[in-house]
Amino acid sequence: MVSTFSRQDQNYKNDDLNQPSKEGRFGKYGGQYVPETLMPALFELETAASNAWKDKLFVKELNHLLKTYVGRETPLYEAKRLTEHYKTKHATTRIWLKREDLNHTGAHKINNALGQALLAIRMGKKRIIAETGAGQHGVATATVCARFGMKCIIYMGAEDIKRQSLNVFRMKLLGAEVKVVNSGTATLKDATSEAIRDWVSNVETTHYILGSVAGPHPFPKIVRDFHAVIGEETKKQCQESFGSLPDILLACVGGGSNAMGLFHPFIKETSVRLIGVEAAGSGVDTDKHAATITKGSVGILHGSMSLLLQDDNGQVQEAHSISAGLDYPGVGPEHSHLKDIGRAEYGSVTDQEALDALRLVSELEGIIPALETSHAFAWLDKLCPTLEKDTHIVINCSGRGDKDVNTVASSLDI
């Protein structure tokens, strides 16, 4: 089997969509599974974020920087040749791309990095740490640290450094110190573990800009809320472009931040299908994949309860994806919750399917998507033949593929 699809019966109530709880739970997922030394920092961060969103000056500064520094709002672009490619006898599927790849630094990651940097300033923290896999979150964090004159340390796995040498250079050029992580699989999971260890040791002076909707509460909510601008803009742009809500939202899922940013403003719009696409790697029936929602079970990783890839003894297993940004054995707790209650659907595609989609989108639209994003595009092959009426699909084009050129060049025969 090369790909899978998971859709639960819809069994949610309105309360299921108002998440997280005061305890930081998304249903049974989430929480704070951290050393006692981090609890005051998490409480401080939760309070700072809550107060910041109520502060008109904070919101004004954030919106000003999103516009003048990041380049928002990003366009909603109709991919007409891709639409023509997927047209069937039964339906014309109009495909729209939310162009997060056009943000400053080339991906959605800067929405969250900028917001958390402003929170760090409010808390008086001048040292910033972050983890990165594909390098995009590292670049975004290094960028905002340069903008605000903050010390920046980025943890990155040795394996990912090999795959993403261009982004490593960009981080260093921006003034960040890149710390190589050789432990474990030397990928994103291990980089995150090292960043958390640093934070435990330096919590008084340091803010950890976690890059996905994972980790202990309040990180999943904070990261989601800073990325929700993606979905808020999309909702408005859909009304302007075709006069209604979209029928389907489609995004890749590793930890799940770009998907959650797109999905969140539509959570209560239950006519809109939410579809996340994970990395099936060499296939979900092998041991080389990162399809956490599809194949995982409940466990605890990096301070949060969620679905994980783990063995019968609860040991976290290695994940695999050609995409460094999806090469993670966990997923954000809200995604696990949305899957359980049937509000969102999740599938997975292989490395080869993602590569084929990257090539197709490049040739048809003149847009080279990131390998992460290409997983979402690949799902169109499975989705479009099932549609029986004219449908508007919005794909979150979460990042550009410049960083992946070396990997793609060694994998595609061009």
From Swiss-Prot:
Residues 10-26 have a biased composition (Basic and acidic residues). Pfam families: PALP. Pathway: Amino-acid biosynthesis; L-tryptophan biosynthesis; L-tryptophan from chorismate: step 5/5. GO terms for cellular component: cytoplasm. InterPro entries: Trp_synth_b_CS, Trp_synth_beta, Trp_synth_beta/beta-like, TrpB-like_PALP, TrpB-like_PALP_sf. The keyword Lyase applies. Its cofactor is pyridoxal 5'-phosphate. The keyword Lyase applies. One of its GO terms (molecular function) is tryptophan synthase activity. The modification N6-(pyridoxal phosphate)lysine is found at K109. Its EC number is 4.2.1.20. Residues 1-26 are annotated as: Disordered. It catalyses: (1S,2R)-1-C-(indol-3-yl)glycerol 3-phosphate + L-serine = D-glyceraldehyde 3-phosphate + L-tryptophan + H2O. Keywords: Amino-acid biosynthesis, Aromatic amino acid biosynthesis, Lyase, Pyridoxal phosphate, Tryptophan biosynthesis. It comes from the Bacteria. It is an enzyme of class 4 (lyase). Tetramer of two alpha and two beta chains. Belongs to the TrpB family. The beta subunit is responsible for the synthesis of L-tryptophan from indole and L-serine. This is Tryptophan synthase beta chain. The gene is trpB.
